[in-house]
């Protein structure tokens, strides 16, 4: 597996990320959208690259402008999840998909975790040629989404 840091241009400042390439024949690509206030090197982005590359997929994870809770840019401008907007997040995902297309990987599989899962559904609607969508801990939606919790049986003791 080959790993390299990447920079994705936007209308403001570039988005940092990482691209993992399999050591064998490339069969496709996958683009990962991280959860709220997370980043490209935490959570599922720590174990997914190896699994995706084993399947022959190039795997890209990147920071949206709303990554982490709060930071500063150029030692002055406050940035991060505390200042993010959904419109900016949707745009960042589109920038990343465009960057992948420019690298020769059009229409990647989309993986979205939590808030990234919510954003990924919009991305797939906007990009109908997307071959697959994988939701990781995204909101459950549907008729029972607003019911009281406790019936999910999330713990081993349940």
Q: What function would you assign to each model-found segment?
A:
Residues 107-112, 136:
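Short beta-strand immediately N-terminal to the catalytic nucleophile in serine-hydrolase-like folds
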Residues 23-65, 69, 73:
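Short, surface-exposed "cap/lid" segments of acyl-processing enzymes
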Residues 80-102:
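Alpha/beta-hydrolase active-site loop
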Residues 122-126:
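Active-site signature of alpha/beta-hydrolase-fold catalytic machinery across serine-
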Residues 146-158:
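A catalytic-pocket lid/entrance helix-loop region that shapes and gates access to the active site
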Residues 111-116, 120:
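Gly/Ala-rich beta-loop-alpha elbow adjacent to hydrolase catalytic centers
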Residues 134-143:
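Active-site nucleophile loop of the alpha/beta-hydrolase fold
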Residues 1-24:
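N-terminal cap/lid segment of alpha/beta-hydrolase-fold proteins
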